[in-house]
Amino acid sequence: MTRIYEFQEAKSVAVCGDIHGKFDELVYRMTTLCGMTDTVVIVAGDCGFGFHKRDYYDQVYNRVLPKLEKSNCWVVFVRGNHDNPAYFDGETVSGKRWMAVDDYSLVVTPCGNILCVGGATSVDRYNRESYRPLFHLGKNEGVLYRKPIGYIEEPVSMDPADWWPMETPYFDESAMESIHHAGRSVQAVVTHIGPSMCEDVMPPTWIDYLVENDPTLPADMRRDRETMDALLARLRRDCHPVRHWLYGHYHHSWQSDINGIGYTMLREMEMKELR
């Protein structure tokens, strides 16, 4: 079932690229550099949850809360590959002014409804200490890390780590059915990666270097994009009036209008207002 987040007081919505744990800088940019007020900022993954103990994030929230309250702003975090999925259940991080939402959540604002779907394959996973034991045991086949519908996964540890098995995106048919039958329209989509027709700016030489140690990486990355393609196809099938699709992950900027949808890749800390 899709979780709905309503922000009826919001007068604008912006989407931000990867922040990689720079929570204080994000709020400073929002409230001081950009002077945002009455704004919902959605972070398109790689937020940085999971690299520290849980109480660390509570401390950060309490530190930035006064600025968010004074400016009447909110932060919505979407899951990236450099995030512990356990934080993105809609409950673990659920402050009044910031929240880490589960996949296929719908952010409802006077500016439109935004569908949030996280996840991606870490291209640098072989260099992550938490990944290497699985690799050497021969368990790095991408299918093991994909979340099939109806799959009841074991609880993900909240202990600090640098990589998590359930990092990839998944297509949730039941969530899309829920949105469709509820009569909710989607005007914008925020994901961590884009559909296959979108730019990914991954240098071939870099991929070749990574594949030497991680041979299943290209296939896993391809499946990620195919998952986004399936999401796009379902949105079109249900006739959602999608105008914007924004994503991060690649640490570069790019944008293009394709078949009536404005696709935007955001670099780290780059913010774009939805209009």
Predicted regions and their residues:
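Beta-strand-turn-beta hairpins that frame and shape the catalytic cleft
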Residues: 3-14, 106-116, 185-188, 257-263
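A general structural motif
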Residues: 9-10, 36-39, 72, 111, ...
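Residue-level marker for buried hydrophobic side chains located in beta-strands
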Residues: 13-15, 42-43, 189, 246
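Core catalytic region of metal-dependent phosphoesterases/phosphodiesterases
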Residues: 16, 21-111, 209-211, 216, ...
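Catalytic metal-binding/acid-base residues of hydrolase active sites
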Residues: 19-20, 47-48, 81-84, 120-121, ...
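Proline-aspartate-enriched helix->loop->beta-strand connector
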Residues: 38, 185-195, 233-247
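Binuclear metal-dependent phosphoesterase catalytic core
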Residues: 109-110, 230-238, 250-275
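Active-site-proximal loop/helix segment associated with metal-binding centers of metalloenzymes
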Residues: 112-226
